[in-house]
């Protein structure tokens, strides 16, 4: 009973906050400067990571690029240098905790304190549970979420000491809405979203106001990782569009970025709609892509 009374007493504050949020919709958000910031991007040798590096290079940030693919990493670095940025590259296996920690130690010793961390590296296996091998499940979690713990543990202490920093989690719409035949991937992205939300709350509880957090949750992106994706929610997103939204979110310090915005509405519906209706709605959304179905093979 006391809890309900406390909630009722908060209603005036809810009205004020709602009005404040509505007014802010019509006021352009001020973008912060990232000139001279040391920006570390994992998975920088391809796709979203590469294009994000280009954008930070244009803004005169100092770049630290990590990827397991040396050739892709060098291509990204060359373009960033052509844009006038100072660039440092490290071949890092983000599924290996010790590799992350040793590389982080080199970054701090040779370059300085990372002030913007973009946890972007990711892997995906499109198959049902029967066809997904144990090492694939392990690697999915090691890269898609455990690496976020290790990089954040490595670089957050300096951010908190300086009360200045930004941690970016590249997750997915699949971290909010489940998709069949992406079981390991969805599970890891749900964990990544949970990591972002809990880290955000933990920083607030510790009153570390200068370290910001942002989480990116796009629908299917045309990066080649998932073959022939389609959904009635809209066309497959181009990486350039996603990175433009990501950069705007980082520079205006948005906490959660959904692309398209309808994903946010869908996540709300999932919490309130009857289960039977929700099943019909998911069939209408019609998510499709090429996948290996091990259940059929086992049944033969």
From Swiss-Prot:
Gene3D superfamilies: NAD(P)-binding Rossmann-like Domain (3.40.50.720). InterPro entries: NAD(P)-bd_dom_sf (IPR036291), SDR_fam (IPR002347). Keywords: Endoplasmic reticulum, Lipid biosynthesis, Lipid droplet, Lipid metabolism, NADP, Oxidoreductase, Signal, Steroid biosynthesis. It comes from Homo sapiens (Human). One of its GO terms (biological process) is estrogen biosynthetic process. The lineage of its organism: Eukaryota, Metazoa, Chordata, Craniata, Vertebrata. It is an enzyme of class 1 (oxidoreductase). Belongs to the short-chain dehydrogenases/reductases (SDR) family. 17-beta-HSD 3 subfamily. The active site is at 185 (proton acceptor). NADP(+) binds at residues 40-64. Present at high level in steroidogenic cells such as syncytiotrophoblasts, sebaceous gland, Leydig cells, and granulosa cells of the dominant follicle and corpus luteum. In lung, it is detected in the ciliated epithelium and in acini of adult trachea, in bronchioles, but not in alveoli. In the eye, it is detected in the nonpigmented epithelium of the ciliary body and, at lower level, in the inner nuclear layer of the retina (at protein level). Widely expressed. Highly expressed in retina, pancreas, kidney, liver, lung, adrenal, small intestine, ovary and heart. This is Estradiol 17-beta-dehydrogenase 11. The keyword Cell inner membrane does not apply. Substrate binds at residue 172. One of its GO terms (molecular function) is oxidoreductase activity, acting on the CH-OH group of donors, NAD or NADP as acceptor.
């Amino acid at each position: 009973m006391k809890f309900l009374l406390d909630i009722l007493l908060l209603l005036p504050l809810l009205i004020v906050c709602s009005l404040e949020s509505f007014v802010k919709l019509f006021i352009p958000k001020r973008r912060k400067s990232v000139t001279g910031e040391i920006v570390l991007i994992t998975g920088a040798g391809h796709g979203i990571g590469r294009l994000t590096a280009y954008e930070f290079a244009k803004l005169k940030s100092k770049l630290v690029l990590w990827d397991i693919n040396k050739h892709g990493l060098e291509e990204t670095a060359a373009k960033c240098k052509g844009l006038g940025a100072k660039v440092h590259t490290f071949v890092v296996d983000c599924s290996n905790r010790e590799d992350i920690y040793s590389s982080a130690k080199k970054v701090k010793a040779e370059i300085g304190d990372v002030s913007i961390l973009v946890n972007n590296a990711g892997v995906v296996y499109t198959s049902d549970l029967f066809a997904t091998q144990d090492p694939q499940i392990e690697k999915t979690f090691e890269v898609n979420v455990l690496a976020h713990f290790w990089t954040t543990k490595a670089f957050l202490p300096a951010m908190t000491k300086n009360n200045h920093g930004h941690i970016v989690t590249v997750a997915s719409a699949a971290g909010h809405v489940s998709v069949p035949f992406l079981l390991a991937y969805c599970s890891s992205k749900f964990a990544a979203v949970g990591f972002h939300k809990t880290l955000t709350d933990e920083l607030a509880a510790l009153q570390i106001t200068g370290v910001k957090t942002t989480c990116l949750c796009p629908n299917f992106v045309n990066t080649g990782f998932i073959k022939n994706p389609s959904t009635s929610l809209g066309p497959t997103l181009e990486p350039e569009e996603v990175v433009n939204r990501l950069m705007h979110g980082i520079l205006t310090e948005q906490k959660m970025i959904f692309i398209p915005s309808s994903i946010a509405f869908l996540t709300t519906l999932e919490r309130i709609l009857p289960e039977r209706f929700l099943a019909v709605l998911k069939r209408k959304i019609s998510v499709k892509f090429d996948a290996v179905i091990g259940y059929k093979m086992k049944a033969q």
